[in-house]
Amino acid sequence: MEKKEKVNQITEGVIWKQLLLFFFPIVFGTFFQQIYNTADTIVVGRFVGKQALAAVGGSASQISNLIVGFFVGLSSGAAVVISQFYGAKDKKNVSKALHTAFAFSIAAGIFLTVVGILLTRPALLLMKTPADVVEDSAIYLHIYFGGMIFNLIYNMGASILRAVGDSKRPLYVLIVTCVLNIILDLLFVVAFGMGVTGVAAATVTSQVISALLVMGMLLKTEEIYVLKLREIRFDQRMLSSVLRIGIPAGLESVMYNISNIVIQVFVNNLGTDTVAAWGTLGKIDAIFWMVINAFAISITTFVGQNYGAGKYHRMRKSVRVCMTMSMVGAAALIAVMYAFAPWIYSLFTTDSAVIAHGVHMSRYLLPSYFIYVIIGILSGALRGTGKVLVPMILTCGGVCSLRILWLFTAGQMYPGINTIMLSYPVSWSITAVLFIVYYFMKFPGKKKEN
């Protein structure tokens, strides 16, 4: 019961303190998640070569991000539903939502494994992946999709734990699997000389372990969110609720990734050095995105539980606190990444041309990252209340569609990496303004609390 009281402080305690208590484990988790993700890139970049670096960090990375991003969006639907029922102390519906979420993860994992393996090579060719990179990219993705079901189970399980206020145990899982992934990367690639195959095998093995650990935590808990294998099944009403919130979030992620894939196609036309630098940039600035995402997860859970408890004024106040913390964190990250860009890129590769391209890209884009903070936090807050359709439309129109339009107009008239990169701050600025207007119009906070 003591543990339950601690979790329920999200709806009762001092806002800034409870946000930080929930947020910090996620921040540390993002750190280990990024080490986990970048270990593959560092190992192939330094011990295999720039073709392998481009294979793991280029088109293959965009395709895997597209698939996983959609499912993470869907899992956020389950997290919102569970957090609202948990805040309302509705034990029966927490259980129904949890078991429906796991049934969906298993079914989706099987489907994506089959489809992913079949469509990998056509997708790589469609993206105009450089010829010297296609084969390694296909090998990496075939193995990656082979372990997709474990990836989805872990992401769903971790989302559920965070939804009920437990951000610590997902962190512990990330630490274990991060260390394991690095050890296996070095063993398979450096010791056994397995190249891209070794990197993919290390990633999948680590995902299997992470899925088993998260499932074990949910199976052994004595709380109302206990997982029972025999009860894993679809509940039609719960599935509808999860998909109502999850599909718009998933489509939002897909549109982000589609726009990034279109950008990758334009980058692929600029040569292997630029492709390798762009892929490395994606690994480096993922640190920033994952920290902001940690704030967004925090505010989604915080808003969701308080929404379920009927504490609307507390929700709005928590958004202001979270936005302030996010901006401070963003400033610190941007300063470090800007100042130490050459050294950071040298960790990934010794190729001077790749490093030079990468440093230019980072320093061009970093100042505009503040704008995205507004989108991330307001989107997370709105998602916690179940308002997902309009934010999805704003994101798809303001960020994704505008970005693609920019590439096929300005990108054609003024070809080059600077024009490609400019699509980010332009689309973010317009979308941020739209989110601010919608937030002040529709976000609960002026209603009388229960």
Question: At which residue positions do the language-model features occur?
Answer:
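Small-residue-rich hydrophobic transmembrane alpha-helices
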Residues: 53-114, 151-170, 277-341, 372-395
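Residue-level signal for short hydrophobic patches within transmembrane helices
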Residues: 12, 16-35, 39, 63-70, ...
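Small-residue hotspots at the loop-to-helix junctions and early N-terminal turns
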Residues: 48-62, 137, 141, 200, ...
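Transmembrane helical elements of multi-pass membrane transporters/channels
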Residues: 21-40, 143, 154, 177, ...
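Helix-terminus/linker motif at the lipid-water interface of multi-pass membrane proteins
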Residues: 31, 35-54, 124-131, 187-194, ...
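Short runs within selected transmembrane alpha-helices of multi-pass transporters and secretion channels
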Residues: 75, 143-162, 170-178, 199-214, ...
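Short alpha-helical transmembrane segments in multi-pass integral membrane proteins
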Residues: 1-23, 82-147, 191-247, 303-368, ...
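Transmembrane alpha-helix boundary and packing residues in multipass membrane permease domains
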Residues: 26, 30, 42, 80, ...
